[in-house]
Design a protein with these regions (language model features):
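Anionic group-transfer/hydrolysis microenvironments
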Residues: 20, 27, 103, 222, ...
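Short beta-strand-loop/turn "lid" adjacent to the catalytic site in phosphate-handling enzymes
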Residues: 75-112, 132-134, 167-188, 219-232
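Active-site core segments that coordinate phosphate-bearing ligands/cofactors
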Residues: 2-11, 15-16, 120-176, 185-202, ...
Length: 452
């Protein structure tokens, strides 16, 4: 069996890069999918001119820094450069809106999944398609821009997501995994292509409004996992590794979204399996072939191979918790006892298990941004208590952990109680579950099933 150093030297290591909401992660694995090196970059979205966004400069600087840190990890562990790879793949925050003209120029700043500015469009398309179109989906962003009469829309030549953008720039290919594509526009049942009837309806709406493009012309081509999706071009290699060490010609997998990577990481891609991801946002996904009524709280996406998935997605999970932990961190520094963030999170999460089952009468509303599941267009985080509430650290933390999953529970209850989707176990991942046993227990209480 080859050592990790030999795998890297022989160009057989595989690199995956994921763009999360707060961290860009680059992980190198060997032939048995064992991590052998990693690098990361911290970043954060900004609210600019009414939209949550990351700039192109943020994207490229973050990608290059995460990759640079990976290279340094490889050199430190294995005393050799990283020049060749066996394969490469991207994943990222799904949905959102990155619109480009025929010259490849970004027409408006990137509008992320977090924006809740597309309510009118989402409602209209849901009615027209008889299929739930959430506010964060790319097609809702596009139609809202059309309804707003935004002048850039007529110039659109390509519309994609963050992962789709990165894949395009590094390969020249306008293709993406079907799971990622299912968060842009509905996928036809039993196919790995956009739903033809819905495409026709949307193209008719666009034509009536005077637009000359069609969805087939501007959307990426969906492909299932395992389909060749291009190779790293010399220009792409220079974008990823400006030092010039990385050689082009590396095959790329179809880019996927964070939903698809979550399903794969938890091995929840077969019918009847389910997983939950909880971090900046949280979402639960159940692989099911059931025909369901239209619910605004339930999204229908697909696995990376195109199997239908019922998803409950909530914009808000840990952002409010993160803000409070930062406050405690600042206090610790002020009294001369600074704490590492990781240790502080562990301490505070464990305190939650000491709290009363009802949080001592405390109430937290964790809406850092809008929450479409509850019909909220803007976020206003709140911490509320009555004079006779029991305010202590255990109750405080327990309340915030329970609040982080409250909106998710509403959607899960619709799936299990109204739609009778069988849920027997959930596989969990994400920052909410880093402290052993804490987030897992809170999630099990919310979903009323075992969580592992």
């Amino acid at each position: 069996m080859e050592s990790a150093a030999e795998v890297i030297r022989d160009g057989k290591a595989v690199l995956g890069i994921e763009f999360g909401s707060t961290r860009i992660k680059a992980v190198l694995v060997d032939g048995k999918c064992k991590p052998i090196a990693s690098g990361s970059h911290e970043w954060e979205n900004r609210l600019e001119h009414g939209y949550w966004t990351y700039s192109l400069e943020d994207i490229w600087a973050g990608l290059q820094d995460a990759y640079k840190n990976l290279k340094e990890d490889v050199r430190e562990k294995y005393q050799q450069p990283l020049k060749r790879l066996g394969a490469l793949g991207f994943s990222g925050m799904m949905h959102g809106y990155m619109a480009f003209d025929a010259e490849g120029k970004l027409l408006v700043p990137f509008r992320t999944w977090r924006n809740t500015t597309t309510g009118e469009a989402a409602a209209a398309l849901t009615k027209a398609f008889d299929f739930n179109i959430p506010q964060r989906w790319s097609i809702a962003h596009l139609y809202q821009a059309m309804l707003n009469g935004e002048p850039h829309v007529k110039e659109i030549s390509f519309l994609t997501t963050l992962a789709g953008f990165l894949h395009w720039k590094l390969t020249g290919e306008k293709r993406m995994g079907v799971g990622e594509a299912s968060g842009m526009f509905p996928i036809g049942r039993g196919s790995c292509a956009y739903d033809k009837e819905m495409v026709h309806k949307f193209d008719s709406l666009a034509a009536e409004m005077g637009y000359s493009w069609t969805l087939e012309q501007i959307l990426p081509q969906p492909v299932p996992a395992g389909t060749p999706a291009g190779v790293l071009t010399p220009e792409g290699a220079a974008l990823l590794d400006p030092s010039g060490d990385l050689q082009p010609g590396i095959p790329l997998a179809p880019c996927e979204g964070d939903a698809g990577t979550g399903m794969t990481a938890t091995n929840a891609v077969r019918l009847g399996t389910g997983n939950v991801s909880a971090g900046t946002s949280d979402f639960a996904m159940l692989v099911t072939d059931r025909e369901m009524a239209v619910h605004r709280e339930i999204d229908m996406v697909t696995t990376p191979s195109g199997i239908p998935v019922a998803m409950v997605h909530c914009n808000n999970c840990t952002s409010d918790i993160n803000a409070w932990v930062s406050l405690f961190e600042e206090f610790a520094e002020a009294i001369g006892a600074p704490q590492e963030p990781g240790k502080l999170y562990t301490l505070l999460f464990r305190k939650a298990l000491e709290g009363s089952p009802d949080g001592g009468g405390l109430v937290s509303c964790n809406f850092y941004s809008g929450e479409p599941v509850l019909g909220l267009n803007q976020g206003r985080p709140l911490m509320v208590r009555s004079p006779d509430s029991q305010l202590n650290l255990g109750n405080f933390m327990r309340t915030h952990l329970l609040s982080a999953l409250a909106a998710l529970k509403i959607g899960l209850d619709i799936l299990t109680r109204q739609e009778k989707v069988e849920l027997t176990k959930l596989y969990a991942h994400g920052g909410f579950f880093k402290t052993k046993g804490v987030g897992q227990r809170i999630m099990a209480a919310a979903a009323d099933v075992p969580v592992s």
